Regions:
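Well-ordered, non-membrane alpha-helical segments in soluble/globular domains
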Residues: 49, 166-170, 260
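Electropositive, surface-exposed helix/loop patches at the edges of structured domains
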Residues: 190-192, 243-279
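A transmembrane-helix-recognition feature enriched in membrane-embedded lipid enzymes
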Residues: 3-68, 96, 136-145
Length: 284
């Protein structure tokens, strides 16, 4: 019970302003707190509350959501936790994480009972492409819930590009880790078996977080690419959390990339690898 109650305690205010610190000590509900990016936690909770009801229906009523390994969330610290997951839709994946994390705050680790939306976990962030989060009203609304927006150096507007790496991304992810939990999709795309980007390995080496591998399935069948429109209802959705791990800070980047690829089960199956090799031979 005490472990659950600690999830409702406010964190120490960020910043040196005396007024900010005084308000924090008096504010047991976190009404005056803001995250490291300046967004009030109250606003984030309102966004999660508003978006949570219709998305709960989509996940747990119109479809069948199964959560495995939720007990691993029990012993996690409140900060410096990095969730790494494969990616199937733009928004349905991360919305599901918000539901699960908010339920875990209330001590629920296997099923979703949406009363947690009255006090959701607001100290959660997710890494997302800036162009995706700026593409309309709904993405902009979701961004307020905790998006750490980055400019992808390899892809823009659906096309492959080459541009300078967004150097601010690592600093912003570090801010998120210092304040709470961060979800990242290390492939940077919803394409299955896409290669893992080295940026994730750099984040792990630089911040030494608790890394929680996650494997999701069924979202691509249930929703369209954005995750906002149904493709097939009554689909089995699965979110499987694996045992948290620490990486050795001295591990080479290539080794971390290989391990991440394996633990989120994104190694290319042999039959697909053979088909790709045959196609390349035919085109050469």
């Amino acid at each position: 019970m005490l472990k659950i109650l600690r999830n409702f305690l406010p964190f120490q205010a960020i910043g040196d302003k005396p007024l900010s610190r005084i308000l924090n000590y008096l504010d047991i509900f976190g009404l005056f707190q803001s995250d490291p990016f300046g967004y009030p936690l109250l606003l984030k909770r309102v966004v999660i509350f508003v978006a949570g009801w219709p998305t709960y229906w989509r996940l747990a009523v119109a479809n069948k959501l199964t959560i495995e390994g939720g007990n691993y969330l029990k012993e996690l610290p409140n900060t410096n936790v990095l969730f790494i997951s494969n990616h199937q839709t733009y928004f349905a994946d991360v919305i599901t994480f918000y539901h699960i994390f908010s339920a875990a705050k209330w001590g629920m680790f296997r099923k979703l009972y949406p009363f947690y939306l009255f006090s959701p976990r607001a100290k959660t962030f997710y890494v997302a492409a800036r162009e995706t989060m700026k593409s309309g009203f709904i993405p902009k609304l979701f961004a307020l819930a905790g998006a750490i927006m980055v400019d992808r150096s390899w892809r823009a507007k659906g096309e492959n590009v080459q541009r300078d790496v967004d150097t601010s991304a690592a600093d912003n992810v570090q801010k998120g880790l210092n304040y709470g939990w961060v979800v990242t999709f290390p492939q940077g795309t919803t394409t299955a078996y896409a290669p893992i980007r080295k940026g994730t390995a750099h984040l792990i080496k630089d911040n030494n977080p608790v890394v929680v591998p996650v494997v999701i399935d069924g979202f691509r069948r249930a929703f369209n690419k954005t995750g906002l429109t149904y493709k097939k209802r009554n689909t089995n959705l699965k979110v499987r959390f694996k045992q948290p791990i620490y990486f050795d800070k001295d591990q080479p980047l290539e080794e971390i990339v290989a391990m991440v690829t394996k633990i989120i089960e994104q190694n290319v199956p042999e039959n697909i690898a053979e088909w790709k090799a045959e196609a390349e031979n035919l085109n050469s």
